[in-house]
């Protein structure tokens, strides 16, 4: 896109992975950050407005953000992008494997963004990364292009290689030039044992992880000391201690405190992570909050093991107890 239209920018949601901003700097291309809706997804009205008033060449949509696990409204967003002539890249690095759950034999999950996962096939390019749900180490990701001839824009020549074929070689179109085949071989072996099937292998695993996340979220909603930010669409759950005041500063302090107390408990530690959200995104998720600072931390749990469902109630109960102790102190 930069080679054909260097004046165009790239649009991403404010919850998109931080590496998109980094690549914008590498490409020396302006990045446009778009707001999100009450479910942490790219806001469609903001997307259309940006396309109307800003020269945007590419829109990045995310199938499972790493912060909230949210799936952008991919189907509707692609339709808007086609209307304005913008190409679409889908970042399916984290949530792409949840596409396996769209099958007659797969378990049914109410509210699962089925149409958005189906629409991934309509994108111009898709990033996939088996180092997460594909059970692989780093180095086993790739980008798939609908039109393979775009490889010519990435081509770089060498005076002593690439003479064996008229087709573009991977080394000619990648930044790394050469890549070890071990990661691809390891993925092949893994998928022989755990196939890409909806009720077996990887499909069964991601289905169990989604169920674990929903179970975790259900337990949060049953406890007054904790507040769920948005129902999980993948296996990531974002939540916060119910603050003693409806302000971002109170949420930030309570989240930091609960995170540290839970992790550092010598007898019964609970390991979570913190996720920092800008004020506009967090107040959109939780309209009852007042933005008295620019951002705030919330808690984030990733249920990437099917076994997590078994312990969800116990762990959430432990977090709720610690949160109540903080409030009562």
Where are these predicted regions, by residue range?
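Active-site C-terminal subdomain of aminotransferase-like
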Residues: 84, 104-233, 242-245
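Conserved alpha/beta core surface patches that mediate binding of polyanionic ligands
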Residues: 165-172, 215-221, 266-289
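Short glycine/proline-enriched loop/turn "hinge" motifs that connect secondary-structure elements
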Residues: 23-25, 51, 177-181, 285, ...
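Conserved PLP-binding catalytic core of the aspartate aminotransferase-like
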Residues: 227-278, 283
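Conserved PLP-enzyme active-site core in the AAT-like
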Residues: 1-155
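A generic structural motif
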Residues: 65, 193-196, 243-246, 304-310
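PLP-dependent enzyme catalytic core of the Aspartate aminotransferase-like
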Residues: 283-329
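Long, low-complexity, charge-dense
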Residues: 72, 192, 207, 211, ...
